[in-house]
């Protein structure tokens, strides 16, 4: 897609910093390595204050440091509850060391099966939310049945 894979996180960080300028200031300008714009007005502003949450995904060694430095949450992939508990402890320590409130950094685990016990274990390990992915269905009626099955397994 034309991106610089080697520097994807550098570009991502810079784009997020540029967006935060646009989201939080009446007039903003940005001068970076990848993105530059003169003093501009950008409206409408996001409803969420100070800006929409920035959720970073992945499992790279430095992702938790990135989350603490310029994110608001983490979206890990292919993680177990035990590994999540370790990562939550690391994330909390890094946040405290950086002067951030650890509870202000969310963790969302995605793509999980409709397993009430597994979801409870993820919450106990420090996840703020667990996203259950329904099976692909061909019709709306089939999807309704699938969502009811998930609700029965997880919520009721």
Residue map of PLM features:
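Active-site-adjacent structural elements that line small-molecule/cofactor binding pockets in enzymes
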Residues: 1-156
